[in-house]
């Protein structure tokens, strides 16, 4: 039996943070996806890029290696999530976990999967990360211009698209940035 690992990069961008935001993941020129919102944070975008990648590869049994320049994403999934779950999705200080709906979806998407995350320094020339960064920035720029970006080809055979990346769908998160 041959073992295969899907190698991808995921990234997010927010112009103004919060502001127009985009996310993107990249495997190859034929296999990538983007999405975003008119108003969100970079962390929401970073998390959603990974979530969409996990959902679009859920029908496969292959291992997944995700390059990511966000330590927040990597630590959330690999270190902090078990404690948050034990505490009812609360942090150690008792405060609610931010982006909890995305975190819960990530927890579900990770279940039974063999996924490894590797941190890469952003804007350091890592080919896959640079491609994901370009996609995320282009998606955020589209939202800034009030246009919905083309979602990209996605992963062959994927049956799920992340619904929160569609216009008007992200309403569950509190507005932490208004006065």
Language-model features: where?
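RNase H-like nuclease fold core
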Residues: 1-48, 55-58, 62, 141-142, ...
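A short, charged, Gly/Pro-tolerant segment at domain boundaries
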Residues: 150-162
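Alpha-helical transmembrane segments that form the membrane-embedded catalytic/substrate-binding core
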Residues: 46, 132-137
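Acidic, His- and aromatic-enriched active-site or binding-groove loops in soluble protein domains
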Residues: 137-152
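RNase H catalytic domain
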Residues: 7-9, 13-20, 51-131
């Amino acid at each position: 039996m041959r073992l295969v690992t899907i190698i991808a990069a995921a990234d997010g961008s927010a112009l103004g943070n919060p502001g127009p935001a985009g996310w993107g993941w990249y495997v190859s020129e034929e296999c990538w996806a983007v999405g975003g919102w008119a108003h969100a944070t970079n962390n929401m975008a970073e998390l959603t890029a990974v979530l969409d990648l996990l959902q679009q590869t859920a029908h496969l049994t292959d291992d997944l290696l995700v390059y990511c320049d966000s330590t927040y994403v990597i630590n959330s999934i690999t270190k902090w999530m078990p404690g948050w779950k034990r505490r009812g999705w609360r942090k150690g200080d008792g405060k609610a976990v931010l982006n909890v709906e995305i975190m819960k979806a990530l927890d579900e998407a990770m279940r039974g999967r063999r996924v490894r995350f590797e941190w890469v320094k952003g804007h350091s020339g890592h080919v896959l990360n640079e491609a994901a960064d370009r996609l995320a920035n282009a998606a955020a720029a589209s939202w800034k211009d009030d246009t919905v970006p083309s979602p990209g080809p996605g992963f062959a055979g994927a049956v799920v698209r992340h619904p929160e990346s569609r216009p008007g769908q992200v309403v569950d998160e509190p507005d932490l940035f208004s006065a």
